[in-house]
Amino acid sequence: MERFFENAMYASRWLLAPIYFGLSLGLLALCLKFFQEIFHVIPNIFSLAEADLILVLLSLIDMALVGGLLVMVMISGYENFVSQLDIDEDKEKLNWLGTMDSSSLKMKVAASIVAISSIHLLRVFMDATNIKPEYLMWYVIIHMTFVISAFAMGYLDKVTKH
């Protein structure tokens, strides 16, 4: 009976595979939104104010960071919790494949969230005249919460490894 439960629990890791595949569909949706934003800005490029162009570019950078985060979670999560990726030797491999454990994945995710939050905060500050001061305060508090959390996770990871 114990062996059955252990084998069933171990096999249940494959339930994560469609979730990671679903993230790739999310990446496709993000890609479509990215190009929608580009095609939206191109016809207006010469009439667009510099600040508005910077806001669009920050939005594109934000999407690129989220896309990278999705790829990182998808691939390393699959490798850590489902199965190793068997990529042909003649194919190009990402240099971090097979090297990112769940601890380093958490740190990369935390760093990505801080970067994404920073971009969002910069976009908010560029439009600060249209945002209530108490909202600005909360944006900064939330961002600092992400920064402190990422720092604390890194510190705890360092302390527990040594």
Curated annotation (Swiss-Prot):
* Subcellular location(s) per record: Cell membrane
Q: Which InterPro entries match?
A: UPF0114 (IPR005134), UPF0114_bac (IPR020761)
Predominant place of localization: membrane
The question of whether Ribonucleoprotein is a record keyword is answered with: no
Q: List the disulfide bonds.
A: none
**Residues annotated as transmembrane:** 15-35, 53-73, 109-129, 136-156
Give the membrane topology, semicolon-separated if more than one.
Answer: Multi-pass membrane protein
Going by the UniProt record, its keywords in alphabetical order are: Cell membrane, Membrane, Transmembrane, Transmembrane helix
Superkingdom, natural source? Bacteria
Keyword Signal attached: no
Instruction: Give an example GO cellular component term for this record.
Output: plasma membrane
Q: Name one Pfam family in it.
A: UPF0114
The record's family statement is: Belongs to the UPF0114 family.
Q: Which HAMAP family match?
A: UPF0114 (MF_00143)
Q: What is this protein called?
A: UPF0114 protein Psyr_4257
